[in-house]
Structure formats: C-alpha cells, structure tokens
Regions:
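Non-catalytic terminal and connector segments of soluble metabolic enzymes
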Residues: 1-134
Length: 134
C-alpha cells in the first residue's frame, strides 16, 4: 500500500468533495482526514526547507489565515505520489483539468492544494500531520 500526504489550503475548503472525488478517480482513497488550524510550530516543521527564503513569512501567514484539510491518502500499486501530483497540477502554470487550474485563483502561494513531492516527503509529512498512524 502506497501512501502520500495531501492538504487543501486555506480559502479552498469548499472544494473538498470535488477534490476527494478526483483523488478517488485515480483509485486512491482518503483513509484519514482532519480539519486543522496550523501554527508556527507545525508550519516550521512542514516547510523546514523554505525557512530563510524571501517568501517564507508570506507563506506562513497565508497558511495560518484559515483552516486546512489534512489528508492521508493511500492506494494499492505504484506511483501514487506522482499520480497525485499529476491531478494536482504544477505550481506555476497548472494545466486545464488539474485541481490547481480548475479551483485556483492564479496565485503561486494560494494554489488550492499541497501534495508530497516524493515518497520520502510523504513519510515525513504524514509523520507531522498524522503521527498517530505512523
């Protein structure tokens, strides 16, 4: 069973059902989810590689601006992380038919959704947001 982490960002929770339907459309399932209000501690752990970069403060402020939906996603087989990233779409120029294109507002930071970029990132992020299942 492969697993990955997906998070709906502040301001986009109204798209939860449609986003989950797209995840299920590739044969994956959201096995655990929770609505959370993020704080500095969890954001510093989640975005550790971005600490000190010019956009970090804006990113943290945005991510604290409202609730998020954290999701533990699983699927039998291979390539779950890549398949999720395909339906999510690129950060800068998402293609039509992707989650970021279809539900986004054209901003890089406020881009609807986060998904792990590798199996290693998925394990780390699931450990941060779902320690009870790791």
């Amino acid at each position: 069973m492969e697993r990955t982490y997906v998070m709906i960002k502040p301001g986009f929770l109204q798209h939860e059902d449609a986003i989950i339907a797209r995840i299920e459309g590739i044969g994956a399932k959201v096995s655990h989810k929770k609505v959370m209000q993020l704080d500095d501690e969890i954001l510093n752990r989640h975005y550790a590689e971005h600490i000190g970069k010019g956009f970090f403060a804006e990113l943290v402020n945005y991510m604290k601006s409202g609730e998020v939906i954290a999701m533990y996603v699983e699927r039998e087989g291979e390539n779950l992380v890549q398949d999720i990233r395909t339906i999510v779409g690129s950060t800068k120029d998402p293609a039509p038919g992707t989650i970021r294109h279809d539900f986004g507002i054209g901003e890089i930071t406020r881009n609807v959704i986060h998904s792990s970029d590798s199996a290693e990132s998925a394990a780390r992020e699931l450990g941060i947001f779902f320690p009870e299942f790791n």
